[in-house]
């Protein structure tokens, strides 16, 4: 009625879902006719939509827009400032990002011998859920590791082994400070992991 263009962007459709839509083809075709443009993630998805009745003239493969990301310049600048203020240029910074229980414990158990042998290593721990911040802090202390907290405005000191990044909205900052990054959600069942594209966008080697 208002003649507002309707676009389906970053479209993805599995074979199973396509079969389901095909069972209600009348409804599906009516819905697809209402689209002015369909931009699919890949050729397979595009073909499934075409098979369901989408107009080829209004359709094309755009790719996944998840890859079209870049780090905010403000965080890059802040990271450069902190790197200088905290004397991180000569240190190896490993970030454990978006971690779940008991991922921090497993990873710190594996890293502890290296932290004790190599004082130039510092691990940034960024738990996924804020309600776990205090529990994670206590767990780090149980490893007898020198730990500071972002929420207390603690700096990373020469003796700091672990830095608990218990803040919100600063993930880009921690990625920008990293030499290596582990993104959590992948060690637990059912797994799957969280978004690895942000550290990769900063050219940080990511596990």
Q: Language-model features: where?
A:
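Redox-cofactor binding/interface segments in oxidoreductases and associated redox assembly factors
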Residues: 40, 96, 183
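Acidic donor-binding loop of glycosyltransferase active sites
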Residues: 158-191
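Active-site and donor-binding regions of nucleotide-sugar-utilizing enzymes
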Residues: 1-61, 65-69, 74, 100, ...
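Conserved catalytic-core segment of nucleotide-activated headgroup transferases in glycan assembly
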Residues: 71-153
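Short active-site oxyanion
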Residues: 33-37, 93, 121-123, 161, ...
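Structural loop-to-beta junction motif characteristic of Rossmann-like glycosyltransferase folds
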Residues: 4-5, 180, 185, 198-207
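Residue-level signal for inorganic ion chemistry
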Residues: 38, 64, 107, 182, ...
């Amino acid at each position: 009625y208002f003649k507002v263009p309707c676009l389906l962007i970053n479209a993805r459709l599995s074979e199973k879902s396509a079969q389901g839509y095909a069972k209600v083809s009348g409804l599906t075709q009516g819905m697809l006719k209402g689209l002015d443009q369909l931009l699919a993630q890949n050729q397979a998805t595009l073909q499934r939509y075409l098979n369901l009745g989408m107009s080829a003239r209004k359709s094309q493969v755009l790719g996944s827009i998840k890859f079209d990301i870049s780090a905010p310049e403000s965080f890059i600048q802040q990271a450069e400032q902190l790197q200088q203020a905290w004397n991180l240029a000569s240190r190896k910074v490993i970030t454990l990002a978006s971690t779940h229980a008991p991922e921090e414990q497993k990873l710190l158990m594996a890293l502890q011998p290296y932290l004790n042998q190599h004082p130039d290593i510092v691990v940034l721990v960024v738990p996924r859920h804020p309600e776990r911040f205090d529990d994670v802090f206590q767990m780090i202390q149980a490893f007898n590791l020198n730990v500071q907290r972002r929420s207390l405005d603690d700096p990373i000191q020469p003796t700091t082994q672990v830095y608990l990044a218990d803040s919100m909205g600063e993930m880009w900052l921690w990625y920008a400070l990293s030499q290596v990054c582990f993104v959590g959600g992948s060690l637990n069942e059912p797994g799957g992991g969280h978004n690895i594209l942000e550290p990769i966008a900063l050219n940080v080697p990511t596990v």
